[in-house]
């Protein structure tokens, strides 16, 4: 016999110690007039070692202070409640920890909860909160399907309690003679110690079985008791949707009416659905649905469902709502590196499908006709491809557009406006750089072996330009060095660019700063230098002082070993004369310097108009 293991709440006086436990079925059932045998076992701590073991059963409550009716005691001489006198008996042997209870001649008033209390003598008396609930039936229980639909196989169950060992039930079916292909079967069910005889009747109901009564009868061997239960068959047929009408296409903003007609037994409930959403429902034969000011979300599949308790049937129609394109949605590579491919997809919802165009300015970059998307591709991306684009979607009901920006990342570019300007109190160099992302900018002074960056006292960062350029300003105070060379270097994650800055001398500015006295001194210096150079040429190789021009670094294809001193001497003589007369010099376009090359110098060969920028006097 299978029993349910239950946890125990121990109540009463005396010691409370684990493991006290009791086992019994939580629910029992029996037919009125029969009996029920309630299996029960209990346990207690071994250390108690009681001299005697007994017990009793309460009805309705486990608490002695509530004076519940006593059902049965293990000691037969003890009193019990009059309702159970002669009916209930303590079948188990408490010394063997068996607390089985038997109740005969059951009646409906004996249905309820039964509690066991152990008595080990003295104060060792405990009530278990776990209990068995008894249900007394007047007849077998028939379980009929919620729906008996014509043509569908059905099964009716007849359940009979089988918890009285002296009385074993016998089950028969009644009213099955006219049923189509009836098949009866039986089986025993054991639900946590409570047993039932379960009979099943399978058949295929027809419309003509409507109202037919089918039941089950129960008898017992060696007993005159009998029980009967039956039910009338309510065979119905599922509804049918017989009519459906309404438009299949409308324009956004229109009013729409849909109609549905159905029949069935019983009269069906008619419902209008869009997807799983119920829009309207009423019982009857027909139902109309009104949609006002429809939009794109109101389109789709509309279903009319006719339903009763035995089945359902539906039919659907498709409603299409035409509307102008919605704002296009942009997806793709909106941020790329120069040289990488660009792929941007523009998608727009509309009905019908729209003509999609991607524009930059007035130029068509990509187009698609009657599609829900268009893809623009550029291979490879160039810095000039960055900028604002627009996607336009249009159909016969309207148009819409969305603008988007493509950013092309590229290494720094030093702008032509970058240069150095000499003033009376020093040099001011401006470097302007364009790049994406922004670059870090420094000034390199090779002749001083110095790098000036943001944070240095001679470095000033100007506000970003309207074109996104960044500007760094280098201010060098003091006299202008003849050999001063300034490079602007910029770097971001895509590369490094360096450029020699051109020197710009405002006309007459140097001469104005020098003044008449300075002019006399400068003229004397020029005469001395010219004479000195002439002497040097005559005494070449004799160990006398000589003028040694600084050789420029070799450029691509250049020869750094060429002896260019005569030209440098001639240039120096002309340069000093021009400087003394206040002549502006230093024209020429700035030159780009790659990160791996030396800063380019002016060529040492060629006409005198392109002399080296500087020279030095060295006395041996």
From Swiss-Prot:
Exclusively expressed by myelinating and nonmyelinating Schwann cells and oligodendrocytes. The keyword Repeat applies. GO terms for biological process: cell adhesion. PROSITE patterns: IG_LIKE. SMART domains: IG, IGc2. The chain crosses the membrane at residues 517-536. Keywords: Cell adhesion, Disulfide bond, Glycoprotein, Immunoglobulin domain, Lectin, Membrane, Repeat, Signal, Transmembrane, Transmembrane helix. Glycans are attached at residues 222, 314, 331, 405, 449. N-acetylneuraminate binds at residue 117. Residues 539-562, 583-620 are annotated as: Disordered. It is found in: Membrane. PANTHER family: MYELIN-ASSOCIATED GLYCOPROTEIN, SIALIC ACID BINDING IMMUNOGLOBULIN-LIKE LECTIN. This is Schwann cell myelin protein. It comes from Coturnix japonica (Japanese quail). The lineage of its organism: Eukaryota, Metazoa, Chordata, Craniata, Vertebrata.
């Amino acid at each position: 016999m299978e029993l349910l293991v239950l946890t125990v709440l121990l109540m009463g006086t005396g010691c409370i110690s684990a493991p006290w436990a009791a086992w019994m079925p939580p629910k029992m059932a029996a037919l009125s007039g029969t009996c029920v045998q309630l299996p029960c076992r209990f346990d207690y701590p071994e250390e108690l070692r009681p001299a005697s073991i007994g017990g009793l059963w309460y009805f309705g409550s486990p608490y002695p202070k509530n004076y519940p009716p006593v059902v049965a005691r293990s000691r037969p001489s003890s009193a019990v409640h009059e309702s159970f006198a002669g009916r209930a008996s303590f079948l188990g042997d408490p010394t063997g920890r068996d607390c089985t209870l038997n109740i005969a001649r059951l009646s409906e008033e004996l249905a309820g909860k039964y509690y066991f209390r152990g008595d080990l003598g003295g104060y060792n008396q405990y009530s278990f909160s776990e209990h068995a609930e008894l249900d007394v039936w007047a007849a077998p229980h028939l379980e009929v399907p919620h729906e008996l639909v014509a043509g569908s196989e059905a099964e009716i169950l007849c359940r009979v309690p089988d918890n009285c060992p002296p009385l074993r039930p016998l089950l028969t079916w009644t009213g099955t003679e006219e049923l189509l292909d009836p098949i009866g079967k039986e089986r025993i069910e054991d639900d946590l110690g409570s047993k039932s005889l379960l009979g099943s009747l399978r058949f295929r109901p027809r419309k003509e079985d409507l109202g037919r009564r089918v039941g089950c009868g129960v008898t017992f061997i060696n007993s005159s008791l009998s029980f009967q239960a039956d039910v009338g068959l309510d065979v119905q047929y599922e509804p049918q949707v017989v009519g459906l009408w309404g438009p299949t296409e409308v324009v956004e903003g229109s009013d729409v009416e849909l109609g549905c007609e159905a029949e069935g037994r019983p009269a069906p409930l008619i419902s209008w659905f869009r997807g799983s959403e119920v829009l309207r429902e009423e019982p009857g034969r027909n139902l109309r649905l009104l949609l006002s000011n429809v939009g794109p979300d109101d389109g789709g599949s509309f279903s009319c469902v006719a339903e009763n308790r035995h089945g359902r049937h539906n039919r659907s129609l498709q409603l299409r709502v035409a509307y102008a394109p919605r704002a296009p949605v942009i997806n793709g590579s909106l941020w790329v590196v120069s040289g990488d491919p660009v792929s941007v997809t523009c998608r727009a919802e509309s009905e019908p499908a729209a003509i999609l165009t991607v524009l930059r300015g007035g130029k068509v970059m990509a187009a698609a006709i009657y599609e829900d998307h268009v893809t623009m591709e550029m291979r490879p991306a160039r810095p000039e491809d960055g900028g604002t684009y627009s996607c336009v979607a249009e159909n016969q009901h309207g148009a819409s557009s969305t603008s988007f920006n493509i950013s092309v990342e590229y290494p720094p570019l030093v702008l032509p406006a970058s240069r150095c300007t000499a003033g009376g109190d020093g040099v001011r160099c401006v470097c302007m750089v364009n790049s994406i992302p922004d670059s870090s900018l420094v000034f390199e002074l090779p002749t001083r072996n110095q790098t000036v960056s943001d944070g240095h006292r001679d470095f000033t960062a100007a506000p970003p330009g309207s074109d996104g350029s960044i500007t760094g300003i280098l201010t060098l105070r003091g006299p202008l060095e003849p050999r001063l060379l300034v490079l602007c270097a910029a770097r971001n994650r895509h590369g490094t660019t360096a450029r020699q800055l051109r020197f710009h001398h405002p006309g007459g500015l140097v001469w104005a700063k020098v003044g008449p006295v300075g002019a006399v001194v400068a003229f004397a210096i020029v005469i001395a230098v010219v004479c000195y150079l002439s002497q040097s040429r005559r005494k070449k190789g004799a160990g006398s002082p000589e003028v040694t021009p600084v050789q420029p670094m070799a450029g691509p294809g250049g020869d750094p070993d060429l002896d260019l001193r005569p030209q440098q001497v001639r240039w120096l003589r002309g340069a000093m004369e021009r400087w003394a007369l206040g002549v502006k010099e230093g024209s020429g376009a700035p030159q780009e310097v790659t990160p791996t090359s030396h800063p380019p110098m002016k060529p040492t060969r060629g006409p005198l108009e392109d002399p080296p920028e500087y020279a030095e006097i060295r006395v041996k």
